[in-house]
Amino acid sequence: MGSNVYGILTMVMIAEFVFGNMSNGFIVLINCIDWVRKGTLSSIGWILLFLAISRMVLIWEMLITWIKYMKYSFSFVTGTELRGIMFTWVISNHFSLWLATILSIFYLLKIASFSKPVFLYLKWREKKVLLIVLLGNLIFLMLNILQINKHIEHWMYQYERNITWSSRVSDFAGFSNLVLLEMIVFSVTPFTVALVSFILLIFSLWKHLQKMHLNSRGERDPSTKAHVNALRIMVSFLLLYATYFISFFLSLIPMAHKTRLGLMFSITVGLFYPSSHSFILILGHSNLRQASLWVMTYLKCGQKH
């Protein structure tokens, strides 16, 4: 039974890995082509480019972590190796979440229509707002790295003191739980900001539909379509990131009980977010959608010939 579950999870993980690299790689390729051709990118182009890169790094890091843990275990890694693994995960996870949050703020400022002076002030200074959020989140990143480094220093000290394999594994399980809890704490702020942006955009859509109803105009005007498209992308991000968030909690159980199958399941759940959301971004962005349709048409023509 265990071997069958292991085989199924392995196939799902490989599919997520391939699909995630293809969708994120496609976003990187199209935006790089636009960058070379035009000499610059729009705000959303830069956000999508670095978001896709951070997700590709995150996907590769999760896969490498799984392989290393399943084959060698982390009980005998050096401090340098452990820092490399942990810092890569922290940085890629941080930008994967914060850039998606910045994308939510971008949609809110670009599409929502509020008459409040504060919102209008932020809307007129959209690029500055996005830049401030981007620079501000670096403070969270530095704090996160410092905290993780403290945990690594403490674990390495315990590692050198404990000679037996069982005590080292037990220490690493405790260390892993501390790191996961740290990641959960630092993920709350950007997730909350994205959720608030989503709620405000829903409220903006509701007000817009009321206005359309009073003016006896159709509900499928360009503004309504823009609202719905942005909401579709944002709700998919929130739901998929919720699964990624849950995977953190799921990881606490196998780490505490040292079950490799449980850890594999939590990583499979976690991979679903960076692998799937980029595909939704392709469908929701006109340039990316047109490029994907062109590629599909080209491939179909190639098969016929």
Curated annotation (Swiss-Prot):
Membrane topology type: Multi-pass membrane protein
The answer to whether keyword Glycoprotein applies is yes
Tell me the residue ranges located in the Extracellular compartment per UniProt.
Answer: 1-7, 65-88, 150-182, 254-262
The SS bond pairs are none
Which segments sit on the Cytoplasmic face? 29-43, 110-128, 204-232, 284-305
Q: Which residues are glycosylated?
A: 162
| Localization terms from the record | Cell membrane
InterPro entries with a match to the protein in the record:
GPCR_Rhodpsn_7TM, TAS2R
PROSITE patterns, per the entry: G_PROTEIN_RECEP_F1_2
Query: One GO MF term, please?
Result: G protein-coupled receptor activity
Q: Which GO terms describe its cellular component?
A: plasma membrane
Q: Which SUPFAM superfamilies match?
A: Family A G protein-coupled receptor-like (SSF81321)
Task: Provide this UniProt record's keywords sorted from A to Z.
Answer: Cell membrane, G-protein coupled receptor, Glycoprotein, Membrane, Receptor, Sensory transduction, Taste, Transducer, Transmembrane, Transmembrane helix
Q: What is its main location?
A: membrane
Stored Pfam families: TAS2R
Membrane-spanning intervals of the chain? 8-28, 44-64, 89-109, 129-149, 183-203, 233-253, 263-283
Q: What does this protein do?
A: Receptor that may play a role in the perception of bitterness and is gustducin-linked. May play a role in sensing the chemical composition of the gastrointestinal content. The activity of this receptor may stimulate alpha gustducin, mediate PLC-beta-2 activation and lead to the gating of TRPM5.
UniProt lists the family membership as follows:
Belongs to the G-protein coupled receptor T2R family.
Q: What else is known?
A: Most taste cells may be activated by a limited number of bitter compounds; individual taste cells can discriminate among bitter stimuli.
Listed name of the protein: Taste receptor type 2 member 13
- Lineage per the UniProt record: Eukaryota, Metazoa, Chordata, Craniata, Vertebrata
